[in-house]
Amino acid sequence: MQPPTSHPQVPAGLPPDVAREVSQVLSRRNLLATLGVAAAGSALAVVSYRDEAHAATTPHTAKAAAATGETTPKHAWCMVIDLRTCDGCAMCTRSCQQRHGLREEQTWIKVYSMEDSSGGTFAMPRPCMMCEDPPCLKVCPVGATLRTDEGLVLVDTDTCVGSRACMAACPYEARYFNWTEPPASKRMPMPSTPQMPVAKKGTVGKCVLCADRLPQGELPACVSGCPMGVLYIGDLVTDIAVNGPGNTVVLSEFLRDNDAVRYKEELGTNPRVYYILGHGQKLGGQA
């Protein structure tokens, strides 16, 4: 296994709330620094261990773009979830809900209890899979679902008419209908954008990987909110991934060395969320 890159650690003895803020600042600096260094070194690096097999069908990867003469996106976002260290605390869910002004039942990232091979259980966070071939995009009657060049699948709630066709098409059950107006919060009233959507009544909402944060080098709320460092935000172009505590890994090596898998990969949606499994864990049925 490729060891995480060493970075400044949070000083010991700080109050929990202060330590959390310091950790998030260090993580943000880490993401900005590593993205900048990696991008300057090689904008057309091999983007992941599985691209040899998928280059012909994934036009938003750096290799495929180079082969076709297309402009290479600066980033190709993905997520890595290390289930070996997930304790099911659901802080990822709560951090997301707080950031996006969601109600308790609106779980854009949901933690499932799964059964392992020994009959025990383990926790599995499930965000939007950010599919390279998203079924939800094809069925929307008004074009409210879009996919950016950097691989983010977003919803324009100003266009969405709430047909729920996208919900039926999503094999991951990662979309939610907004039955009520969003609760009052500090970010309201604010205009809704695909990068920072407002969960307006009568529309469909979903995880957007905190798309408004990424250009500033900030971590998604679920990543920074996870106390166990389970969630990594990764970039297939620069080939790095960073978690909340600030650990940085070479993405392709991290995936390869830990035999990363993708949920329901057999469906051909090419999800950009990778799971690292512990002993006896499998992405099968719920417990």
What do the predicted segments below correspond to?
Residues 19-32, 51-55, 86, 92, ...:
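Twin-arginine (Tat) signal peptide motif
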Residues 1-26:
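N-terminal secretory signal peptides
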